[in-house]
């Protein structure tokens, strides 16, 4: 997912994070172009996907081993390490785990589903190992006079250690300076990207609005939307969504990541499996938008084929074998069959 929760945070964001986010989008766009150029030869495309999967697994495994090693080293060095240094080490490990989860999210669109689930389990296990370590080490130094506090204090300490995991997902912060529609209430907002060179576009702080976007754009960011209906043409790269409630969103993209969504319906066409985090009451159905020129826009974005991935949702906060209770398929009798919009009204 990727925006901040407060305006003041956006103004003080480390420029390095902005560059990292931009580079991520460039990589996604480059991957898309590579897939398009390879598509005429199915065998070549299959080989490329296999190569990409192998490359990801190698990088993921290296990072996993590094994190496991750092956890083990921190445990061994705890007796000779001062409290402030220990906290710093644990925080760095937490950031490394978050970066590993981000790596998985960025590459999930071409990975086999079993690799995604296996990798999610690994990330979850690493987080649990860090939680246990922080519970064993940090409370001992601060609360050594309570011998039984070791098993109870991790919960009070976890928010500090896990802070990157809470703060980092809303990374829409870097795009606050990008073109967009912001701070509107009860309006119909229309924008056409036809003939435009806009790379990124943001919808932020909208309440009870209807938004119609036609044409293609490289990346789309949605942040703090309430009681809105959003209809968009295809997005070449990714769509990152944070903090939406009581909304209907009709979206097409290669990757869609949803963070903190509540009681909202998503009509999607997406090349990879949609990802939800910290969300509940969200329902999914197939993309149903129509406007003049949409077929050409879908081809331009490499989204002309329906993959049915709209129904294959990954809940990053639900790793059990049973269906996540946080999302469901929108019943057919409740779905909108077709929505027709225009770029000028």
Swiss-Prot record:
UniProt record, GO biological process: microtubule cytoskeleton organization; post-chaperonin tubulin folding pathway; tubulin complex assembly
Any one GO cellular component localisation term in the record: cytoplasm
Residue segments, region Disordered: 1-83
Bias (Polar residues): 1-10
Low complexity bias (residue ranges): 40-55, 74-83
GO MF, one example: tubulin binding
Annotated knockout phenotype: Disturbed microtubule organization. Lethal embryos that consist of one or a few grossly enlarged cells that lack microtubules but not actin filaments. Failure to localize KNOLLE in mitotic cells. Cortical microtubules-free interphase cells and mitotic nuclei missing spindles. Reduced trichome size with fewer branches.
InterPro entries for this protein: C-CAP_CF_C-like, CAP/MinC_C, CARP_motif, TBCC, TBCC_N, TBCC_N_sf, Tubulin-bd_cofactor_C_dom
Pfam entry (one): TBCC_N
Note: Belongs to the PILZ group of genes that disrupt, when mutated, the microtubule cytoskeleton and produce mushroom-shaped ('pilz' in German) embryos.
Family as reported in the entry's similarity comment: Belongs to the TBCC family.
Name the record gives this protein: Tubulin-folding cofactor C
Species this chain originates from: Arabidopsis thaliana
Name of the gene encoding the protein in the UniProt record: TFCC
């Amino acid at each position: 997912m990727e925006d901040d929760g407060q305006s003041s945070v956006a103004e003080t964001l480390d420029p390095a994070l902005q560059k990292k986010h931009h580079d991520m989008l460039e990589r996604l766009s480059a991957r898309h172009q590579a897939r398009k150029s390879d598509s005429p030869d199915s065998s070549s495309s299959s080989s490329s996907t296999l190569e990409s999967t192998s490359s990801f697994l190698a990088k993921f495994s290296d990072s996993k081993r590094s994190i496991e090693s750092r956890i083990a080293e921190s445990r061994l060095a705890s007796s000779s390490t001062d409290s402030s240094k220990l906290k710093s080490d644990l925080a760095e490990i937490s950031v490394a785990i978050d970066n590993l989860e981000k790596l998985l999210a960025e590459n999930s669109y071409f990975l086999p589903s079993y690799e995604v689930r296996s990798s999610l389990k690994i990330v979850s296990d690493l987080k649990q190992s860090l939680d246990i370590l922080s519970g064993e080490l940090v409370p001992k130094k601060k609360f050594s006079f309570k011998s039984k506090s070791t098993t109870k204090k991790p919960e009070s300490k976890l928010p500090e250690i896990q802070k990157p995991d809470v703060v980092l997902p809303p990374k829409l912060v870097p795009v606050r300076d990008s073109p967009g529609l912001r701070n509107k209430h009860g309006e119909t907002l229309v924008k056409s990207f036809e003939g435009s060179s806009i790379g990124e576009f943001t919808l932020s702080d909208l309440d009870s609005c209807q938004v119609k976007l036609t044409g293609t754009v490289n990346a789309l960011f949605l942040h703090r939307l309430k009681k809105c209906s959003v209809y968009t043409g295809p997005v070449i790269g990714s769509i990152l969504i944070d903090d939406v409630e009581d909304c209907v969103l009709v979206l097409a993209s290669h990757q869609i990541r949803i963070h903190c969504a509540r009681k909202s319906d998503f009509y999607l066409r997406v090349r990879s499996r949609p990802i939800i985090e910290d969300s509940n009451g969200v329902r999914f159905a197939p993309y149903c938008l129509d406007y003049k020129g949409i077929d050409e826009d879908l081809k331009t974005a490499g989204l002309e084929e329906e993959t049915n991935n709209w129904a294959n949702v990954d809940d990053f906060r639900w790793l059990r074998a049973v269906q996540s209770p946080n999302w469901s398929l929108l019943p057919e009798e409740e779905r909108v069959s077709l929505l027709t919009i225009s770029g000028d009204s």
